[in-house]
């Protein structure tokens, strides 16, 4: 609030040749400066963000490829298990008289084990994809936040140089001096 008051006092006592004291220099106004800063952030931040998202996409695609390879391996195991099951069924026909129930139990156990293995693989793949997606989103958020903070700090540091600081002090001293003479 104090800065706003000083700004209006500064405008009212502008040392120009009898003018009202409004700043007509369009390049010195905050709107243009903010537009330029936001434009630069968008221009440069877009490329960085695109590269980051492309890298994350490649990682996710490689994870999907790995999961698909694991799936193919499991399907091959399933085919081997089916072949083994066929062998067991042939042996079951031979031993049907002696131990039909034993063979049926082994068959069910084999099918259940393969089914459980496939379900676990699918669940693992889905969890991996979900966590990779969450991690990518968190990294993008963190990167954007860091860039915004760095941009703001850079803008503040570039605006607060010693020349500007001394000019502001001199102008305020001049304003206070003119107020003292009017009393």
UniProtKB/Swiss-Prot annotation:
Alphabetized UniProt keyword annotations: ATP synthesis, ATP-binding, CF(0), Chloroplast, Hydrogen ion transport, Ion transport, Membrane, Nucleotide-binding, Plastid, Thylakoid, Transmembrane, Transmembrane helix, Transport
Primary localization: plastid
Keyword match rRNA-binding: no
InterPro entries registered for this protein in UniProt: ATP_synth_b/b'su_bac/chlpt (IPR002146)
Family: Belongs to the ATPase B chain family.
Listed PANTHER family: ATP SYNTHASE SUBUNIT B, CHLOROPLASTIC
HAMAP family associated with the record: ATP_synth_b_bprime
Remarks, miscellaneous: In plastids the F-type ATPase is also known as CF(1)CF(0).
Name assigned to this protein: ATP synthase subunit b, chloroplastic
């Amino acid at each position: 609030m104090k800065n706003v008051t000083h700004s209006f006092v500064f405008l009212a006592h502008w040392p120009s040749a009898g003018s009202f004291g409004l700043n007509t220099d369009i390049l010195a106004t905050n709107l243009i400066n903010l537009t330029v800063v936001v434009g630069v952030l968008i221009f440069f931040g877009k490329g960085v963000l695109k590269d980051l998202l492309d890298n994350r996409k490649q990682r996710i695609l490689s994870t999907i490829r790995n999961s698909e390879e694991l799936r193919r391996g499991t399907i091959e195991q399933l085919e081997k298990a089916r072949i083994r099951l066929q062998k067991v069924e042939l042996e079951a026909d031979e031993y049907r008289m002696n131990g039909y129930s034993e063979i049926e139990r082994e068959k069910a156990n084999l099918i259940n084990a393969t089914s459980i293995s496939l379900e676990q693989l699918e669940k693992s793949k889905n969890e991996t994809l979900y966590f990779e997606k969450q991690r990518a989103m968190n990294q993008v958020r963190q990167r954007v936040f860091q860039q915004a903070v760095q941009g703001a700090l850079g803008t503040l540091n570039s605006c607060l140089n010693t020349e500007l600081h001394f000019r502001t002090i001199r102008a305020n001293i001049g304003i206070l001096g003119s107020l003292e003479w009017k009393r």
